[in-house]
Amino acid sequence: LPMAVKDFAFDTGKIFQLPVGAEAFGNNGSITSHSSREHYEKAQSLMRDVLKMAHERGIRMAMGFEFGVIPPEYFSLNVAGDCFYWAGESNMIPNPKSQIAAEIHYAAIDDILNTYPDIDYIWMWLNEHSFMGVDVQKALKDKPFARAYQENQALFKEAADSSARFVGVWALEYMKLTYKHLKSKGSRAKLILGGWGGGHQLPSLLKGLDRALPQDIIFSCLNPDLGKSPQPDFLEEIARNRSVWAVPWLEGDHQLWHFQPRVNMMREQVKLAAEQNLDGVIAIHWRTEEPRFNFRTFARFASDKGADESVDQLY
């Protein structure tokens, strides 16, 4: 349970005005709901207000999720003769060639489209840690997925091994499902692919996915090493074919107990994105006050490609 405001140190809880009956700090949906459904409905109402405010200010907004990540209760839906999922070390991986997996994926997308009909982008993220322990050869015993693998594995020349190629084909199938579903719904939302920037995550698959996916799908990728390293050089090559967004980190989530001076990182990474002819940069963060200098630097160079202030001048 969250800490009660009355227990905040040094009587700082006195500055918070809480709704009647609430003991913790948070939005009304979190602290006044009496059921899970009420909580979800209030959260969605709040996000509809956020979307409305964004559009009033000329800001476009994306919503999405990690594809192929579903609640464990759903795996009981498996039926005889259908290879719905493969077992991993600590989770189960849905098979995108299974009709059950496809319908669950469509339902998640439809929930966003129905709840936020004016959403600008649907952002699909390759799962950060989904494939540990999957037996690729066992997975390829499913004939529909095996056919997809044989047809598309050669696209992923940069992948390190058969397991990485497996993930590439798996991601490709999910992105194809998403793209076709958005078209079938007549949605105006554009599709974005995103993922983590580690060497065994999205970067090694991006060129293969670029070869296979329609060019109106936007590619994005978190910068590697919790943002301490710049975006890969090959994004410049992909940017010749489609819109590409780099994703610098205003702060890393492994050190949120202190300030993280990243002014020079933001300066260099945003300037590099301009040199690579990337279509955009998106910054991620957890806190709002602590990374303010990093954010100001990010915004300065993102809004003016000609900016060239030194780090000393920025501070």
Short names for language-model regions:
Residues D308-Y315:
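Carbohydrate-binding surfaces of carbohydrate-active enzymes
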Residues L209-I218, A239-V244, N277-D279:
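Glycine-enriched alpha-helix->loop->beta-strand junction motifs that scaffold or abut catalytic
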Residues A54, I112, E237, Q269-A273:
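Generic structural signal for hydrophobic
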Residues S130, F234-E268:
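Active-site clefts of carbohydrate-active enzymes
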Residues F219-L222, Q269-V270, Q276:
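Extracytoplasmic/periplasmic substrate-binding proteins
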Residues L1-Q231, P248-W257, I284-D308:
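Aromatic-lined carbohydrate-binding surfaces of glycoside hydrolases
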